[in-house]
Amino acid sequence: MKKSFSYNNMLKKNNIFLIGPMGAGKSTIGRQLANQLNMEFFDSDQEIETRTGANISWVFDVEGEERFRDREEKIIDELTKKQGIILATGGGSVKSHITRNNLSDRGFVVYLETTIEKQLIRTQHDKRRPLLRSSSASGNTRDLLQVLAKERNPLYEEIADIRISTDEQNVRVVVNKIIILRKKSSL
């Protein structure tokens, strides 16, 4: 987790950025958090879909992961420049050093953690996640999630202001924890 805060960084903490693996609840929690705090909500994946006119899976399939990540990086750069927003990011967005810096520098970063078991349950019927579509066809979803966790968890931890497990908590409890911990961190 981030270790130091500057006065300038504290001024930028009026944004809340949700990071974590697929199935952690970033979009669901983000919408409710935005509603409760009366802030504008954005989902980076939805922004990509809106701007391309295609779903994430199609963009991923046609353009490839590298081009998708380029789009994602640019959209997150643009969105993180806004003030007073909640942003749910894609699980792989932290692969970009630029994105990690933008998230860390421009807002309060919440790492929503979940276990692979919960990810499997929460994403088992989701056909929109491009990385899962190919792995579920071959029966290697658990293996893929383990590889992604090994690669990405250290990146989530690197920029997180706080970490919250979403495994055994309902959305309202997680939202309230974020609000309380954000207030405590700004004291």
From Swiss-Prot:
Gene for this chain: aroK
Xref: SUPFAM superfamilies: P-loop containing nucleoside triphosphate hydrolases (SSF52540)
EC number(s) on file: 2.7.1.71
Annotated CDD domains: SK
Residues given in the record as ATP binding sites: G23, A24, G25, K26, S27, T28, R129, Q169
Disulphide-bridged cysteine pairs: none
Keywords annotated in UniProt: Amino-acid biosynthesis, Aromatic amino acid biosynthesis, ATP-binding, Cytoplasm, Kinase, Magnesium, Metal-binding, Nucleotide-binding, Transferase
Family designation: Belongs to the shikimate kinase family.
Top-level EC class: transferase
Pfam family, one: SKI
PROSITE patterns membership: SHIKIMATE_KINASE
NCBIfam families: PRK05057.1
Cofactor note as given: Binds 1 Mg(2+) ion per subunit.
Location of the protein in the cell: Cytoplasm
Chain residues that bind substrate: D45, R69, G91, R152
Pathway linked to the protein: Metabolic intermediate biosynthesis; chorismate biosynthesis; chorismate from D-erythrose 4-phosphate and phosphoenolpyruvate: step 5/7
Primary site of residence: cytoplasm
Enzymatic reactions: shikimate + ATP = 3-phosphoshikimate + ADP + H(+)
A GO MF term: shikimate kinase activity
Biological function: Catalyzes the specific phosphorylation of the 3-hydroxyl group of shikimic acid using ATP as a cosubstrate.
Keyword Cytoplasm: yes
Protein name per UniProt: Shikimate kinase
GO CC entries: cytosol
Cofactor: Mg(2+)
Annotated Mg(2+) binding sites: S27
BP-aspect Gene Ontology terms: amino acid biosynthetic process; aromatic amino acid family biosynthetic process; chorismate biosynthetic process
InterPro entries: AAA+_ATPase, P-loop_NTPase, Shikimate/glucono_kinase, Shikimate_kinase/TSH1, Shikimate_kinase_CS
